[in-house]
Amino acid sequence: NLGGEIRCDDTHTFSLSVNYNPWNFSGNKKMKHFLVQPEYRKWLNEAFTGSFIGLQVHYALYNFWGMLPWGFGNGKMLGIENRQIANNRYQGNLAGFGISYGYQWMISPQWNMEAGISLGYAHLNYKRYGQPAGAPLIEKSNCNYWGLTQIGISVVYFIQ
């Protein structure tokens, strides 16, 4: 994951985050994705200091097969039963928006630490394929998701 952020004025910034995971895991399991997420932030004090609230949009391409993201071991994820996710390949895209809250702590003049969380919406379009690799298309569908869209801790380095 890589991101950058620029100051617009004393209390507003604009950030752009890009996330990329190209790897396959053992047994041809995969959790591939490419995500772009711009965000506008309003800092409650001064930019890059203390609390901020933000508005973001996100777009991603994904290809999941044979494994569940984020430790979803029981129940459902995005309205799909876990055994379907573990036994099928889902390939598609998502687009959505969210609101965020975060906080930055100064570590030194060049370094900060940031913690943040976002809630929002994502519309997913996907194609579902069975096993093994190369299996035919089972269905084309979509679903809507409301909930946690991002959570993280970041190390921030200032380029001056």
What would you call each of these model-derived segments?
Residues 115-121:
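Internal, hydrophobic beta-strand segments that form the core of beta-sheet-rich folds
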Residues 145-160:
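Outer-membrane beta-barrel "beta-signal"
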Residues 90, 141-144:
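Residue-level preference for long, well-ordered alpha-helices that form the structural scaffold
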Residues 74-78, 130-141:
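Solvent-exposed, glycine/polar-rich loop segments of beta-barrel outer-membrane systems
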Residues 119, 128-130:
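Residue-level detector of alpha-helical segments with a strong bias toward transmembrane helices
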